[in-house]
């Protein structure tokens, strides 16, 4: 900045010397004007040399404007310097106005036009500087106002939240004081859920022990009663049937509590005694008496005995068995095949034929005819529906040999 100012000062001083020469020539031409005026002009021109010129080139002004925009938050020294520059500019403008008034009688020259241009440039430069300053000040004010508003709002929100928390605490304390029932003191060191589970487990264990004790007592009583019933003489098994009912009645009379399980056991014992009296078959002890029906068990045992017992000698064969054994298809091979299929043991045909009666012969002939007719009919149906894939039941030799006359 200082170097630029010095260059500008030199340039203006160089320019001012020819201007003074011109003025001197003019003064020589116009002899009517007094010397006092010329001396004043010389003084003013001398003062101008020493004074700092504020008119600058366009490039310098651009640089100054850029620097002013960059340095928005300038220091106080720069502001003071700018104020001094303003004062100087105002003084220069006043002096120029005076000169205008004095030089009204003079003819117009090139120096006036140059001074006007300088004034115009100076005014523009002042306007730009004032604008940049006003902008920087406005920005500072906005930033400060924003920061202040934010800080205020933060303080307010914090204060509000604190006040709300205080109010909540006060309300809670009031509620606690108003409630008549005193809440139990909770021990933070112990886990209440675990304590509750342990207490529940203890209760269950106690209940189990009590139940087991009751069952033991009931079993002991039942055993004593059975022993007493066994010691009493029984005439026959039929008389033993009402003993379980008597036991139940004895239990009721003694005042002990009869459970439904005991009643069921007594009923099943009575039913077993009844079946034993009727069939003579007792249910084994390894079966659960409440799960097995004694009557059905006795029937199954009878069937097993009949199945597994051996054949008695002198048993006559039934009529149907004799008929199947004496059956004749008119062909030896067919007869043998049929007997094998039916499980009939092979006997000599001579013996069987000798023993056959006249009635038996008639029945055998009728059977042979019936089988032949059935075989032919089956072959006919088979040939029509299944395109002769299979012929006959397997007893006849061939379909073609027999012919269709027997139908």
From Swiss-Prot:
Compositionally skewed regions (Basic residues) per UniProt: 24-55, 97-178
Keyword Coiled coil: yes
Chain residue ranges for the region called Disordered: 1-239
Source organism superkingdom: Eukaryota
One Pfam family from the record: SMAP
Residue ranges the record marks as coiled coil: 191-221
Basic and acidic residues: bias regions: 1-12, 56-96, 200-227
Keywords on record: Coiled coil
The keyword Coiled coil appears for this protein: yes
InterPro entries given in the database record: SMAP_dom
PANTHER family: ARGININE_SERINE-RICH COILED-COIL PROTEIN 2
Family: Belongs to the RSRC2 family.
Record protein name field: Arginine/serine-rich coiled-coil protein 2
